[in-house]
UniProtKB/Swiss-Prot annotation:
Oligomer and partners: Heterodimer of Ku70 and Ku80.
Catalytic activity: ATP + H2O = ADP + phosphate + H(+)
Chain's role: Single-stranded DNA-dependent ATP-dependent helicase. Involved in non-homologous end joining (NHEJ) DNA double strand break repair. DNA-binding is sequence-independent but has a high affinity to nicks in double-stranded DNA and to the ends of duplex DNA. Binds to naturally occurring chromosomal ends, and therefore provides chromosomal end protection. Required also for telomere recombination to repair telomeric ends in the absence of telomerase. KU70, of the KU70/KU80 heterodimer, binds to the stem loop of TLC1, the RNA component of telomerase. Involved in telomere maintenance.
A GO molecular function held by the record: double-stranded DNA binding
Record-given protein name: ATP-dependent DNA helicase II subunit 2
Family statement: Belongs to the ku80 family.
Compartment(s) of residence: Nucleus; Chromosome, Telomere
Gene Ontology annotations of biological process type: DNA recombination; double-strand break repair via nonhomologous end joining; telomere maintenance
UniProt xrefs under SMART domains: Ku78
Domain of life: Eukaryota
Domain Ku residue range list: 238-486
Keyword DNA-binding: yes
Keywords attached to this entry: ATP-binding, Chromosome, DNA damage, DNA recombination, DNA repair, DNA-binding, Helicase, Hydrolase, Nucleotide-binding, Nucleus, Telomere
Length: 731
């Protein structure tokens, strides 16, 4: 279970925070909120109910907090609780965004705001185990009552609260920042806050450093969850007394980090008055989070899916009737054919397995090829607080390590699951030892391919040719070698010893972290453009400038020797306007063999025949006729489709038609077709509800041909995007 957290952010919204200082183009409050929003949205993005947040406003126009309401003590005036401690969601972020604005007063005590935050944490956490934290962000220009700081420090330590104080333009020798011509009043306040942070064993620093460190992605620390708990067996203990059984646990060692998945929403259409919209059972089963997110916006609603099953029935309206899922037999696709397998036959394909990790063999480590790894790595450790298992597994690990052997195992993570072949390699460190585990392929998964050699050509007669136009010359090999040396990333220190210039811990995935940054930014700033990509994420997207300069000459020589030439860009509309090369004899073999032009496209082989028909004509009427034939074939495929069995063929046909008509510069023919097809799909005129087909068209981006795809089109990009919505359009 994840550790419970309670964090209170104290945000200074005084009148002085509305000014721009330090050469910045944004106010001190907006600059400060860059850090605060980053921390809050990071917490919200985890989705954990145990990660709670509270927000206190310092130097607000009014006073709204329990300590003020109790006795109306002046020390707690101009302090407002913007957000009580609890899980923060998107509606809370929107509410907080409206509250955080510069006030009209500079009255408010920062020390008292810390007391208020302590009170909030004590009341919420009680005596339960929480990770408690207070973050004060201020410009240090408010009045402060430093009496009783010692008791505040004692309470912070007693409650186990971590105190972090960040200041706008605070002096920080460790970071190397000092504000010139500082107001003596602010200097005194900085000194008071620094003493408070130091005495409470907290952190004190300047806001500039915190904002700068925001661009560096934070490494997510996750709690290990065992993916397998069971026996590691050598031999069968149930049959042989010499069999060995060790209780072990399996954890991820490496895991692929993926960006957040997108959720599907549609523009909502308000129902008639007095009519409510019913929630789909599928949506409700998937949880309430999607529905809450959709309802939070007035313009979006969650996408609801409904699946129906139909079979051909000549007596039913439309030639098909709907059936229940329970009335259907299970089948598998074999090409375009649905193959039925009965339950009795399907049992044969399933192995009756028992959860265990079993040794089935050993190999020398030098004989193992790294390309056999098929998965991320896991670690196998002995069962915790089981000294006998720890000692037994340690003996096995040391034996494999000393003999330089790897073990081959058969892993079944749960009863009834298919087995996996795994490699087990020993790992021994100073304070840790385990077996590293990766998945191996079965014999049926391996394919052996033979490729021709790269340094010679063997003719049909068996002659070996070492000088050929397809083989690199000695000069080319030498120049390429020089270029590779100049591109070497190795770096050396002043003593000539190599060091790692691209440390693994300093390399981040731009895809994962940029999308995460964009989501968190858009949650707070729905209309502002995204901030620029941080340099730490761009570092691996561009060549180092020093390396480019170093390899410039060798690259120029390589281009010259290898005779690299720029390929001209592909011309649009080339198919109709291209002049064919005239043979010297005057006889065109293609014309002689082509025969008569194709007039009719058959439904059995529509795509090749459609292309052939277009290739054999330059008459616009013939092209239009071919488009009409192809349109009728696609509509018949959809109309006669049993479920979605013909949808892939129809999508392929639509894509081919779009590609060919772009090449022939006839966007109008395709746009007229796709408009009519959308209308028929949404009006259920192609054999019932075919909205899933329209969803596939949208997914494949087969909408209108716009001006971006073809300059002569009269459809703008905005019109093309609007057309791909699920609503009827007049584009």
């Amino acid at each position: 279970m994840a550790e419970k957290e309670a964090t209170v952010y104290i945000v200074d919204v005084g009148h002085s925070m509305g000014k721009c200082r330090g050469g910045r183009t944004i106010s001190d409050l907006d600059w400060m909120m860059l850090y605060v929003w980053d921390r809050i949205t990071t917490t919200v993005s985890t989705g954990r109910k145990t990660a709670t947040v509270g927000v206190v406003g310092l130097r607000t126009d009014g006073s709204s907090n329990p300590l003020w309401e109790k006795d109306e003590e002046e020390s707690y005036a101009h302090l407002s609780v913007f957000q009580e401690i609890g899980q923060m969601l998107m509606p809370d972020i929107r509410k907080l965004r409206d509250l955080v604005k510069p006030s009209n007063t500079n009255q408010g005590d920062a020390i008292s705001s810390i007391i208020l935050a302590i009170d909030m944490i004590v009341r919420y956490c009680k005596r339960l185990k929480y990770k408690r934290k207070i973050v004060l962000v201020t410009d240090g220009r408010s009045t402060m009552d430093s009496d009783g700081i010692d008791s505040i420090v004692s309470k912070i330590k007693e409650e186990g609260i971590e105190l972090v104080i960040l200041g706008v333009d605070f002096d920080d020798p460790d970071y190397g920042f000092k504000e010139e011509d500082k107001d003596p009043f602010k200097t005194k306040n900085e000194s008071v806050l620094k003493i408070l942070a130091d005495d409470a064993d907290g952190a004190y620093g300047t806001l500039a450093q915190a904002v700068e460190e925001m661009t560096t992605p934070r490494i997510k620390v996750v709690r290990g969850i065992p993916s397998f708990r069971g026996d590691l067996r050598l031999g069968d203990p149930s049959q042989y007394s010499t069999g060995l059984t060790i209780q072990v646990e399996r954890y991820y060692r490496t895991y692929v980090a993926r960006p957040p998945a997108a959720s599907a929403f549609a523009l909502s259409i308000a129902p008639p008055k007095g009519q409510s919209t019913a929630e789909s059972s599928v949506t409700l089963q998937n949880g309430d989070s999607t529905v809450e997110t959709a309802n939070a916006s007035n313009n979006l609603s969650g996408v609801r899916n409904a699946r129906s099953y139909q079979v051909i029935d000549e007596n039913a309206p439309g030639g098909k009737k709907e059936v229940e899922r329970d009335d259907l037999a299970k089948g598998y696709e074999y090409g375009r054919t649905a193959v039925h397998i009965s339950e009795s036959d399907e049992v044969i394909t399933k192995l009756d397995t028992t959860a265990a990790l079993e040794f089935i063999g050993f190999i020398q480590s030098e004989n193992y090829e790294r390309y056999m790894n098929m998965s991320t790595s896991n670690v196998i450790i002995a069962q915790k607080i089981n000294d006998k298992a720890i000692l037994a597994l340690s003996s096995m690990i040391h034996a494999l390590f000393e003999l330089e052997y790897y073990a081959i195992g058969r892993l079944v993570t749960k009863d009834g699951k298919p087995p996996l072949m795994v490699l087990l390699a020993p790992l021994i460190e100073t304070d840790f030892e385990c077996l590293l585990e990766v998945q191996l392929p079965f014999a049926e998964d391996t394919r052996s391919y033979r490729f021709p050699p790269l340094d010679k050509i063997v003719t049909v007669s068996g002659k070996v040719v070492k000088e050929h136009r397809n083989l690199p010359s000695d000069d080319l090999l030498e120049t390429m070698g020089k270029y590779v040396e100049d591109m070497d990333l190795s770096e050396f220190d002043e003593n000539g010893d190599p060091f790692q210039s691209l440390a693994l811990e300093d390399c981040y995935s731009p895809l994962v972290h940029r999308i995460d940054q964009a989501i968190r930014w858009r949650a707070v700033h729905p209309t502002k453009p995204l901030p620029p990509v941080p340099k730490v994420l761009e570092k691996l997207s561009h060549w180092p400038e020093e390396l480019v300069k170093k390899s410039h000459d060798s690259l120029r020589d390589l281009i010259s020797i290898s005779a690299v030439k720029k390929v001209p860009p592909k011309a649009k509309g080339r198919k109709r306007r291209r002049e064919a090369d005239k043979p010297l004899s005057g006889l065109n073999v293609d014309d002689l063999l082509r025969g008569e032009k194709r007039l009719k496209i058959s439904p059995e082989n529509p795509i090749p025949e459609f292309k052939q028909t277009l290739a054999n004509t330059e008459d616009i009427s013939a092209i239009s006729d071919a488009v009409k034939q192809m349109s009728a074939i696609i509509e018949d495929q959809i109309r006669q489709s049993l479920g979605d069995i013909n949808y892939d063929r129809a999508i392929e046909g639509i894509g081919t038609m779009r590609e060919e008509l772009i090449a022939y510069e006839e966007p109008g023919l395709y746009n007229d077709f796709i408009r009519g097809l959308k209308e028929k799909l949404l009006d259920d005129k192609l054999g019932g509800d075919r909205r899933e087909m329209w969803w596939l068209i949208r997914k494949s981006r087969l909408g209108l041909i716009d001006q971006k795809a073809l300059d002569i089109s009269d459809i703008t990009e905005e019109q093309a995007r609007e057309f791909l919505s699920s609503r009827p359009t007049t584009v």
